[in-house]
Swiss-Prot record:
Membrane topology qualifier: Multi-pass membrane protein
Entry's family note: Belongs to the fluoride channel Fluc/FEX (TC 1.A.43) family.
Catalytic activity annotation: fluoride(in) = fluoride(out)
Organism: Clostridium acetobutylicum (strain ATCC 824 / DSM 792 / JCM 1419 / IAM 19013 / LMG 5710 / NBRC 13948 / NRRL B-527 / VKM B-1787 / 2291 / W)
Keyword list, A-Z: Cell membrane, Ion channel, Ion transport, Membrane, Metal-binding, Sodium, Transmembrane, Transmembrane helix, Transport
GO cellular component terms, semicolon-separated: plasma membrane
InterPro entries: FluC (IPR003691)
Function: Fluoride-specific ion channel. Important for reducing fluoride concentration in the cell, thus reducing its toxicity.
Subcellular location: Cell membrane
Protein's UniProt keywords contain Cell division: no
The protein's name in its UniProt record: Fluoride-specific ion channel FluC 2
Record entry for activity regulation: Na(+) is not transported, but it plays an essential structural role and its presence is essential for fluoride channel function.
Transmembrane feature ranges: 4-24, 31-51, 59-79, 94-114
Length: 117
């Protein structure tokens, strides 16, 4: 049953990630990977909410492990950061990587804080 719940959440999370990433990339003309950045930050924020919300085991598996596991994308984050470095956009790469980490941590803490209100 655990794998089924995680699989359902994961399928939904990957579809939502693809759609949001597609919408963002069509609306921005920047070389900066805004889609992945926004997805990862909102994913960290939502994970903060879920971890402190007192969600039961099954709901947590669907949302945290499944949905957010597929929604956020560390491999794409690394790929885009590396490509910025490789394409001689070192400052953009540095800003992207550091801001993703710092704002991601802040987003997680904000999510935890909001869930306790």
């Amino acid at each position: 049953m655990d794998y089924f719940l995680i699989g359902i959440g994961g399928a939904c999370g990957s579809i939502v990630r693809y759609k949001i990433g597609d919408i963002i990339s069509k609306r921005t003309k920047s070389k900066f990977p805004w889609g992945t950045f926004i997805i990862n930050i909102t994913g960290a924020f939502l994970l903060g909410i879920i971890t402190k919300s007192g969600a039961g085991k099954n709901l947590s598996m669907i949302l945290a492990d499944g949905f957010l596991g597929a929604y956020t994308t560390f491999s794409t984050f690394m790929y885009e950061g590396f490509n910025l470095f490789e394409n001689k956009k070192k400052l953009n790469a540095l800003i992207y990587i550091l801001s993703s980490i710092i704002i991601g941590i802040l987003g997680f803490y904000m999510g935890e804080f909001i869930s306790q209100l």
